[in-house]
A protein has these predicted regions:
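C-terminal amphipathic helix plus adjacent low-complexity
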Residues: 1-7, 142-181
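Conserved catalytic-core segment of nucleotide-activated headgroup transferases in glycan assembly
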Residues: 1-73
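Beta-sheet entry/capping signal
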Residues: 10-12, 51-54, 85, 101-104, ...
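Flexible loop/turn segments at secondary-structure boundaries
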Residues: 19-23, 60-65, 93-96, 111-113, ...
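Short secondary-structure boundary/capping segments
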Residues: 26-30, 68-72, 103, 119-121, ...
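Nucleotide-activated donor-binding/catalytic signature segment of Leloir-type glycosyltransferases, i.e.
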Residues: 71-88
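Short acidic-hydrophobic, aromatic-tinged amphipathic segments that line or gate anion-handling sites
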Residues: 84-88, 135-147
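A donor-sugar binding/catalytic signature common to diverse glycosyltransferases
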Residues: 88-136
Length: 181
């Protein structure tokens, strides 16, 4: 993909709609909002070229035709940072799972969905799945930057973490949404 060295891992950063759930899980611990998280993350990964980075817009960015999102910014920096690319809109999460080695999110569902497929994830803020133990949770800004700097060393997660993610998703997506139970 993108003509990248196939020996390098690929991390996908799953951006949030800028007004999407900023405070749904209480006060944010590291970044004040989705914009700050996205901007700081993109600025940080510029110097980490031992891994390739895909930046994926939240699907609702296209639905709501947001006046501002990070697409223009990422397209602008691609020339100077060939290890960073904007995810084409033609790629969906099912396709992305085939080549992504690490998923990164502030507090989104990719932080639990990708571990269900054995793909490690890095999460920053609290979410509905915080505490189930299937993702790497940043403790503070310094720890988050350390996780990003070592993303190229992350490996497939354990069967126990995969099972935790699968069981959680089954309960959350099937049992809790089934009105017949």
């Amino acid at each position: 993909i993108f003509g990248w060295d196939q020996k390098k891992k690929i991390a996908t950063i799953f951006l949030h709609h800028l007004i999407d759930g900023n405070y749904r899980h209480g006060k944010r611990k590291i970044f004040k909002d989705n914009y700050t998280w996205a901007f700081q993350t993109i600025e940080t990964i510029k110097k980490y070229n031992k891994i390739n980075w895909i930046v994926k817009q939240h699907p609702s960015e296209y639905y709501y035709h947001s006046k501002f999102n990070f697409s223009t910014y990422v397209k602008k920096i691609e020339k100077e940072y060939p290890h960073i690319r904007l995810c084409p809109t033609s790629l969906n999460d099912a396709t992305i799972k085939k080549f992504t080695n690490i998923a990164i999110t502030s507090h989104g569902t990719s932080g639990v969905e990708f571990p269900a497929y054995g793909i490690p994830s890095i999460c920053v803020e609290d979410s509905f799945f915080t505490g189930i133990g299937c993702s790497s949770q940043a403790k503070n800004l310094k720890h988050y930057k350390l996780l990003l700097s070592k993303a190229h060393t992350m490996t497939k997660i354990t069967k126990q973490k995969i099972d935790r993610a699968k069981v959680f998703l089954f309960i959350y997506e099937i049992l809790l949404k089934n009105k017949n139970l």
